[in-house]
Amino acid sequence: MVKTQILGRQIIKVKHVSVKEFEANPSMIWDYDVMMHGTWDANADNVLNDNAVNEIAKYIDAGKGVLAGHDSVGFSMGTTLGLSKIADKFNIKRGLWNNAIQNGYDINNS
């Protein structure tokens, strides 16, 4: 039995790119509908540089998709590192971790 392919469906192509490679050429994301960043716990302390974050912000503004790992926005990144700089684009409220304010936002008092 041959499955009929419907254009734009059932096609998932994944290309693994290192953080260094992405930072050197962040415009590569425009070749894809969705980009993903941050699969390791605490993202293995890989923080994207400002050039990469700015390109991702434009990508989101253009309606493209970004899937971010749970520690790549917030946690120890605060509001000044990596994707946390554009956390508002993800509609994420960041809060407390082990009773220590990581980023100046107390979710319990919002």
Residue ranges and their predicted role:
Residues 1-41, 77, 96-98:
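Aromatic-Pro/Gly-enriched surface loop or interdomain linker
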Residues 41-110:
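A glycine-rich, often tryptophan-bearing local segment used as a flexible ligand/cofactor-contacting loop or short
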